[in-house]
Amino acid sequence: NVVASFERCVFVGNSAARAGASESFGSSQTRYTNCVFRNNTATGSSGGGALWIGTNSAVTARNSTFVANSATSLAGCIINTGGISTVSNCILWGNTGPGGATVGNQLTNSGGSTTVTYTILQGGFTGIGNLNTNPLFVDQAGANYRLQPGSPAIDSGSNSMVPAGTTVDFDGLPRFIDDPAVVDSGNGTAPIVDRGAFERQLPPPPPCPADLDGSGAVDAADLAALLNGWGGSGAADLDGNGLVDAADLASMLNAWGPCT
């Protein structure tokens, strides 16, 4: 048996009669994790714009994003013609076939076994945790499939579906980030994984220049450092006038306490 594993890969702009991006057949096993499939096209009469899954093959897609793939017939994104397919923590959105961006043009099961869980799939699909809700990409038209604040993909995946040892997303950034602005709706213990190839990263904390030692609070240690540098320059020169003076002391006292 052939086992192929793809992680943090992008499949873009490919075209073929049967499988726009990747074809699995025989007794092969293919796994995709943190991958992006976009603008792939199947031109034949029974193709899948992104994936074609043949008899006896097994395909697993986890935390991957499928957008803007197309087919001239059947499934614009994934077609399973007799294999076993498992799709978890993924996003399938805006893939088109003859009928437009319908559920059948996101994923068509034709004689195979398909399980979809904790996935955003346009048009909906039966399975635990699945959603039919706009994933709110940063810029779908510009192929930026990172997640906007408030995306339904944030903290809504299943931690148990993430392959063991996976610690980063497509960008190589931390895979498990808890967004305090979003109620956890996925499966597992916080932090809950996001759906799709990109984990929503938290914005950096606001600058706190008076926190000279980086402890997260302006406190006595910072005051001591400022007084030790009095009359000179350096990090304690908070207003950048070249001199640690009363103005810098006033700024520090005004910022006293935890950095927020």
Residue ranges and their predicted role:
Residues 106, 140, 156, 170, ...:
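Generic detector of well-ordered alpha-helical packing
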Residues 90, 119, 153, 172, ...:
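Residue-level detector of buried hydrophobic side-chain packing
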Residues 93, 122-124, 156-160, 198, ...:
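Phosphate/oxyanion-binding loops and surfaces in catalytic or ligand/nucleic-acid-binding neighborhoods
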Residues 60, 146-148, 194, 217, ...:
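Short aromatic/basic micro-patch
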